Amino acid sequence: MNLTELKNTPVSELITLGESMGLENLARMRKQDIIFAILKQHAKSGEDIFGDGVLEILQDGFGFLRSADSSYLAGPDDIYVSPSQIRRFNLRTGDTISGKIRPPKEGERYFALLKVNEVNYDKPENARNKILFENLTPLHANSRLRMERGNGSTEDLTARVLDLASPIGRGQRGLIVAPPKAGKTMLLQNIAQSIAYNHPDCVLMVLLIDERPEEVTEMQRLVKGEVVASTFDEPASRHVQVAEMVIEKAKRLVEHKKDVIILLDSITRLARAYNTVVPASGKVLTGGVDANALHRPKRFFGAARNVEEGGSLTIIATALIDTGSKMDEVIYEEFKGTGNMELHLSRKIAEKRVFPAIDYNRSGTRKEELLTTQEELQKMWILRKIIHPMGEIDAMEFLINKLAMTKTNDDFFEMMKRS
């Protein structure tokens, strides 16, 4: 029996299962307590129980396996991992572990891990000789992540404009600069769907910090990947803990040569949370930002890299501007030069209800010649020369109308060549 499978089972089915095992009064209990009771009963009959989760090591040396369903929040059904197991398998925070567990004994509160079967979806022996993330060699992104799906839908238009304006590669550190109500969340959903469709081999994680609960639900239903969220009614310390868990998990997977993509909405809110949590240093920048507060969100964003030894970590984050808050401007200014791809959304275009509201002339990718063929690059540059003299709204309307006539960007370039 598997703890994770039970967590995904509806309560009504759990109650039926519990009653068939001879348990009583289940209808009045919380879901976690029902799972607890079922597993205890199951273990009494001498059968094995299995569980998995992402390890968080606490200051005392022991750790717990947290579940992604509860966005890595501490809960009663976490699995205890002893310090000896952590030392033996050289485990670190963020390792995804699955194995055999046992129910709590008298006086204990948590399930405990008995035997480690897998570390990061790999045998435990293989995890011992991996290179630490900090020692891997970072390179420029050189393998393209295509967004275009080629189905001719209106959603695909956004992906195609993105491919033309600022191509994305594996290991990109991208910043989507957006004023409020310019369609940044829709753009992220679009990117997530394109990645799931075109690149199923990549591990996709969507991290929503300080977002509205209904947007979290919408994202979970639309995206085929792991959606981890901390909504705006949660304290800043919770935002920070969730972000740290996600980035640590991503680093551990990159050490195992996986391609990981994190979509973060938004880095501004994350930086605000760090600003609240960090102890006051006494030096305060403009807008009330503590001088030490931006070090950790920069470390988060700076983790994105293409790795020479294999694997990559791509982070595409949104940054808010024009919110009327001086702090947001300062945070954006700090992050401005750090990314190697920038996509600017425009309030003016969005107000005219032209989507995607991308400011084509200001968007772009550094070293885009590594991601595209020489021929494609020439065509993209010619397109920029045509679009540059137009105003931002006219440019976007012109591009969308022309793209709508064709199904793929290759067809669009052919049409451009003929005309």
UniProtKB/Swiss-Prot annotation:
Q: List positions binding ATP.
A: 169-174, 181-186, 212
Gene Ontology cellular component?
Answer: cytosol
Location of region: RNA-binding 2: 284-288
Using the UniProt record, name the top-level EC class of this enzyme in a single word.
Answer: hydrolase
Q: Which InterPro entries match?
A: AAA+_ATPase, ATPase_F1/V1/A1_a/bsu_nucl-bd, CSD, NA-bd_OB-fold, P-loop_NTPase, Rho-like_N, Rho_factor_ATP-bd, Rho_N_sf
Give the E.C. number(s): 3.6.4.-
User: CDD domains annotated for this entry?
Assistant: Rho_CSD, rho_factor_C
Q: Where is the Rho RNA-BD domain?
A: 48-123
Positions of the region RNA-binding 1?
Answer: 61-66, 78-80, 108-110
Query: Listed GO molecular functions?
Result: ATP binding; ATP hydrolysis activity; ATP-dependent activity, acting on RNA; helicase activity; RNA binding
Tell whether Hydrolase is among the UniProt keywords: yes
Q: Which domain of life is it from?
A: Bacteria
Question: Which SUPFAM superfamilies is this protein grouped with?
Answer: Nucleic acid-binding proteins (SSF50249), P-loop containing nucleoside triphosphate hydrolases (SSF52540), Rho N-terminal domain-like (SSF68912)
| Residues the UniProt record annotates as site (RNA-binding 2) | 326
Its keywords, alphabetically, are:
ATP-binding, Helicase, Hydrolase, Nucleotide-binding, RNA-binding, Transcription, Transcription regulation, Transcription termination
Q: Which GO terms describe its biological process?
A: DNA-templated transcription termination
The keyword Zinc-finger is assigned to this record = no
User: What functional role does this protein have?
Assistant: Facilitates transcription termination by a mechanism that involves Rho binding to the nascent RNA, activation of Rho's RNA-dependent ATPase activity, and release of the mRNA from the DNA template.
Enumerate the PANTHER family for this protein: TRANSCRIPTION TERMINATION FACTOR RHO
Q: NCBIfam families, per this entry?
A: PRK09376.1 (NF006886), rho (TIGR00767)
Description of how the protein assembles with itself and partners: Homohexamer. The homohexamer assembles into an open ring structure.
Task: Report the sequence similarity comment from the record.
Answer: Belongs to the Rho family.
The protein depicted here goes by the name Transcription termination factor Rho
Origin species: Salmonella typhimurium (strain LT2 / SGSC1412 / ATCC 700720)
